[in-house]
């Protein structure tokens, strides 16, 4: 068994788990050791929230889904939050991983649609003609130029953030707006949220949304 490859620490709401993927040969080896390590105190994890910090670039969508399946079905946890080790160091877009989060590491092209009841994080661009629907937040580590709807289940606290925020249609809960066709295009990350019943767009300040 790989020593110190998985560190488990308790908190008020559940567990903080730090996984060093550099110490594993592959995902399957990591998952086997993870299950063995947590099985010792399995009964204590029911209904808790688990925060997993690791090198998310080492995971594909299928592996993230399998990981979530193990946590929710085998350990009966209430919530799972994935954090990238780089994000915790750089404080970029932290504070948005609240609740179940789905990661997509690809560019979304015209005609493609993503729909997920939790948060969506896209590492890539969202091209014109594509659509993104999330019950929670939508975060794009790239250019957002397609249609995007956060808080689709009515969550007015949801946010939409991107390195370049220029969607054709932007909607949070039941409030919709369109990006202006003219005007300067900011070179910094922006976040859209609801304030006083309207959608506002402002520079992304990490400490404000942590």
From Swiss-Prot:
The keyword Repressor does not apply. Gene3D superfamilies: 2.160.20.70. Keywords: Cell cycle, Cell division, Septation. InterPro entries: CAP/MinC_C, MinC, MinC_C_sf, MinC_N_1, Septum_form_inhib_MinC_C. The keyword Amino-acid biosynthesis does not apply. One of its GO terms (biological process) is regulation of cell septum assembly. Cell division inhibitor that blocks the formation of polar Z ring septums. Rapidly oscillates between the poles of the cell to destabilize FtsZ filaments that have formed before they mature into polar Z rings. Prevents FtsZ polymerization. Interacts with MinD and FtsZ. HAMAP family: MinC. Belongs to the MinC family. This is Probable septum site-determining protein MinC. It comes from Clostridium novyi (strain NT). The lineage of its organism: Bacteria, Bacillati, Bacillota, Clostridia, Eubacteriales. The gene is minC.
């Amino acid at each position: 068994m790989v020593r110190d490859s998985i560190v488990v620490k308790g908190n008020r709401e559940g567990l903080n788990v730090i996984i060093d993927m550099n110490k594993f040969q592959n995902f399957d080896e990591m998952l086997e050791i993870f299950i063995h390590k947590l099985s010792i105190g399995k009964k204590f994890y029911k209904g808790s929230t688990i925060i997993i910090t690791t090198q998310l670039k080492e995971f594909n969508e299928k592996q993230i889904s399998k990981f979530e399946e193990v946590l929710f079905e085998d350990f009966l946890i209430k919530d799972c939050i994935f954090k990238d080790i780089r994000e915790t160091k750089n404080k970029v877009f932290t504070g948005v991983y609240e609740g179940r989060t789905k990661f997509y590491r690809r560019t979304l092209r015209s005609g493609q649609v993503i729909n997920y009841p939790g948060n969506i994080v896209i590492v890539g661009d969202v091209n014109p003609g594509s659509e993104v629907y999330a019950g929670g937040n939508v975060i794009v580590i790239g250019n957002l130029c397609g249609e995007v709807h956060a808080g689709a289940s009515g969550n007015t606290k949801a946010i939409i953030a991107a390195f370049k925020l220029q969607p054709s249609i932007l909607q949070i809960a039941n409030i919709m707006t369109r990006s202006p066709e003219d005007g300067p295009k900011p070179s910094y990350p922006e976040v859209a949220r609801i304030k006083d019943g309207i959608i506002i767009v402002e520079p992304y300040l990490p400490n404000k949304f942590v």
